[in-house]
Amino acid sequence: MRELTGVVVVVVGASGGLGAPIAAELRRRGSIVLGAGRSGPDIVADLRDVDAGHAVVRGALGTQGRLDGVVNAAGIVAFGDLVATDPVVIEEMFLTNALGPLWLAQAVLPTLAESKGFFANISGVVAEQSLANMVPYCASKAAISHAMPGLRREARRLGVHVADFRPPHTETGLAGRAIAGTAPPFPQGLDPDAVARRIVDAIAANEPEVASSAFD
C-alpha cells in the first residue's frame, strides 16, 4: 500500500468535474494537493504547452519542496461527424488529451523518481471503445491509454508507479463544455465522488490500471 498522508500531489485539471473530487478525496486522506490547470488555482499549466510539466515541477518544489505524485485529470471533448470536424479541433484534442500528458510525464518523471512517487492518468472508457460522432476524442484518449503500459515499464526502472484509469461515463459535465458540436443524449453516468474514491483507492493500492468494468 502507498501512504497518502503528507504526500505532495499535483492534480492537473483540478477544477474539472472529476479532477475536483479526486483532489478533495486526496485531501481527505491527508495529502497536500496542488491544483494545476490553465488558470491554476495553484499552478498555471496548460497541457497544450510543452513546458506544462516543468511548470508543475517548479510549482511543487517551489512551494512544498517535493513532489510525490501527479494525477492528470484534464481533458477536452468535441462531438460531430469526423468529415465535418474542423482539423483545428482535432489537433486541439490530441494536444490536450494525448501529446500533453506525454509531455507532462516526460517532465515530471525525473522528479517523481526522487520520491519514488506515482503518475496517474485518467483516460476513460472511450479508450476501450470507439464511438461514432466522437472519433477524434476516442482516438486521443486511446492513444494516451495505449502509451501507459510501456511507460509503466520504463518508469518502474526509476521507482515510479504509473497507472491508467478508464472510468465509464461519469456525470462530470464535460459533455456540456464541448469545444465543438453538441453532445448526444447519454444515459445516467456514475457519481464523480464515487469514481474519485475508486481512483484514489487504486492509487493507494498501487494498481497499474482500473478498466471501465472495474468501476461500480
Describe the function of each predicted region.
Residues S15:
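Conserved glycine-rich cofactor-binding loop
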Residues A73-A78:
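Conserved NAD(P)H cofactor-binding loop of Rossmann-fold oxidoreductase domains
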Residues D81-L82, V89-E91:
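Substrate-binding pocket helix/loop in short-chain dehydrogenase/reductase
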Residues V83, L131-V135:
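Active-site loop immediately N-terminal to the catalytic Tyr-X3-Lys motif
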Residues A105, S140:
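Active-site helix of classical SDR
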Residues G124:
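Residue(s) in the substrate-gating loop at a strand-loop-helix junction
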Residues D164-F165, A180-D216:
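C-terminal helical subdomain
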